[in-house]
Amino acid sequence: MSKQILILPGDGIGHEIVAEAVKVLEHVNVRHTLNLRLSFDALGGAAYEKYGSPLADETLARARDADAVLLGAVGGPQWDTIDPALRPERGLLKIRAQLGLFANLRPALLYPQLADASTLKPEVVAGLDILIVRELTGGLYFGQPRGSRISKNGEREAFDTLPYCESEIRRILKVGFEMARLRGKKLCSVDKANVLASSQLWRTVAGEMAKDYPDVTLSHMYVDNAAMQLVRHPKQFDVIVTENMFGDILSDQASMLTGSIGMLPSASLDANNKGMYEPCHGSAPDIAGQGVANPLATILSVAMLLRYSMGHIKTADAIEHAVGVVLDSGLRTADIWSEGMTKVGTVAMGDAVVAAL
């Protein structure tokens, strides 16, 4: 029985990087007889231009029917002045919410070949392997009420709401505990419980759940301290679990510990491990169309897709190994290039990974 993957290239460099990931996916599909069927559609700004909406109803229906979704990136300055409800990012938020993709897994893994590319000293980041588990469908980005108005004294003001219910907290903490159990058995729950009521509930629930995971060491950390500790001593962390906005910020910070956000994949999963997979980086409109974008994060997102949503562990391992082989050979895109390495473009990097497979 075949499995269906919906491909959404998105905007900016999305089409370029996704093309290389699809190249890898098609190669392993044939070589490993995976019986995968690929289809394509638009999301974000591309969907706004095609359908008049950043997420068309028919695209959402196709995503529901698919076994997994592979996304490039969304957004661009040409859509910054349109109705906020129609901006590309709203399509991304909507598809996550409608598909119930509440758990975002963002690894921050430093390839030893790229230790010099990190902005931190090699001895601080050597061997770095962190997983950030971010709650994706609740909190400040979705909370109601939200909006803007004129206050009683005539000023413009805007407001947002940060709600979390116990069931939302429990299900993301469960993912955090389970992932920690599979890794180094250390879980750091990040909150702002000294200020926020939602974080106080979060910390209480985490403490209650820890009793069910006696093999996992749970620690708590305020988000401001966590941001500092990620730079001071990042290797103290194994798995970090946190709410939506904190995870958004910390995962981007952690990505730069690895040398380039262009190396980092991500997975967004529902309760049944059906998911959407995308690189951690954005649409990079400043380099779109130049053929210089790093496709490795998207290729590694394919590996995560095969591992978590398809159960093809050996194929996922093979892709990750192939990326390591390519880095060993000295090939680098511009974002990870250093003296003595060979600078290549997007297509050449994708071809090299296929050759290594």
UniProtKB/Swiss-Prot annotation:
Q: In the Enzyme Commission scheme, what number(s) does this protein have?
A: 1.1.1.85
A Gene Ontology BP annotation from the UniProt entry: L-leucine biosynthetic process
- The name this protein carries in UniProt is 3-isopropylmalate dehydrogenase
Species for this entry: Xylella fastidiosa (strain 9a5c)
Residues at which NAD(+) binds: 76-89, 282-294
Q: What reaction gets catalysed by this protein?
A: (2R,3S)-3-isopropylmalate + NAD(+) = 4-methyl-2-oxopentanoate + CO2 + NADH
The pathway it acts in is: Amino-acid biosynthesis; L-leucine biosynthesis; L-leucine from 3-methyl-2-oxobutanoate: step 3/4
* Entry GO terms, CC: cytosol
The record's subcellular location field reads: Cytoplasm
Cofactor notes: Binds 1 Mg(2+) or Mn(2+) ion per subunit.
| Cofactor(s) the protein needs | Mg(2+); Mn(2+)
Q: What are the binding positions for substrate in this chain?
A: R96, R106, R134, D224
Q: Cite the GO molecular-function annotations of the record.
A: 3-isopropylmalate dehydrogenase activity; magnesium ion binding; NAD binding
Q: Where is this site: Important for catalysis?
A: Y141, K192
List the PANTHER family.
3-ISOPROPYLMALATE DEHYDROGENASE
Q: Quote the subunit structure annotation.
A: Homodimer.
| Entry keyword set | Amino-acid biosynthesis, Branched-chain amino acid biosynthesis, Cytoplasm, Leucine biosynthesis, Magnesium, Manganese, Metal-binding, NAD, Oxidoreductase
Q: Which PROSITE patterns match?
A: IDH_IMDH
Q: Which InterPro entries match?
A: IsoCit/isopropylmalate_DH_CS, IsoPropMal-DH-like_dom, Isopropylmalate_DH
Q: What's one Pfam family the UniProt record gives for this protein? A: Iso_dh
